[in-house]
Amino acid sequence: MTKSQKIELVSKLEEGFKASEAVVVCNYKGLNTKKLEELRNNAREMDVKVQIIKNTLASIALKNAGKDGMELKDTNIYLWGEDQLNVSKVADKFSEANQTFEIKTAFIDGEVASVDKVKALAKMPSRNELLAMLLQVWNAPITNFTIGLNALKEKKEAE
């Protein structure tokens, strides 16, 4: 890779990291190409970017994006996106399914986050799931009232 290509890659990564709410760094050592493609497909469905980047280039891009402080060692794959829940869910789900894939560190909410925080975020319901739960709670009294009225109507008709 030439120096100009590296500079271009760093600037593209910097833009992506700046626009993202979360960056998760994982160890992918031992994963075959088929598994990596599976990860990329899962990430694409959730609007999460996935890329294997040299640590030095990633370090420069993260620092320029204001997201430095993560310890970057060994073989890393980077996941980032605008929705921190989606990024966390993709990383956690894939790490549970594949023993060799492990979450190492992350940058969430303007700070370096632990693996436990990433896993906790992954367990949280998404915005759409929360809205569905809220609507279900709001509709429950009306639904129960309607069921009661129908039961009363049927009872009156039976008499």
Swiss-Prot record:
Domain of life per record: Bacteria
InterPro entries for the chain: Ribosomal_uL10 (IPR001790), Ribosomal_uL10-like_sf (IPR043141), Ribosomal_uL10_bac (IPR022973), Ribosomal_uL10_bac_type (IPR047865), Ribosomal_uL10_CS_bac (IPR002363)
Keyword Ribonucleoprotein listed: yes
Keywords for the protein's UniProt record, in alphabetical order: Ribonucleoprotein, Ribosomal protein, RNA-binding, rRNA-binding
Record keyword RNA-binding present: yes
One example of a Gene Ontology biological process annotation: translation
Residues spanning the signal sequence: none
Any one cellular-component term (Gene Ontology): large ribosomal subunit
GO molecular function: large ribosomal subunit rRNA binding; structural constituent of ribosome
CDD domains noted in UniProt: Ribosomal_L10
Self-association and partners: Part of the ribosomal stalk of the 50S ribosomal subunit. The N-terminus interacts with L11 and the large rRNA to form the base of the stalk. The C-terminus forms an elongated spine to which L12 dimers bind in a sequential fashion forming a multimeric L10(L12)X complex.
Function of the molecule: Forms part of the ribosomal stalk, playing a central role in the interaction of the ribosome with GTP-bound translation factors.
The family this protein is said to belong to: Belongs to the universal ribosomal protein uL10 family.
Name of the protein in question: Large ribosomal subunit protein uL10
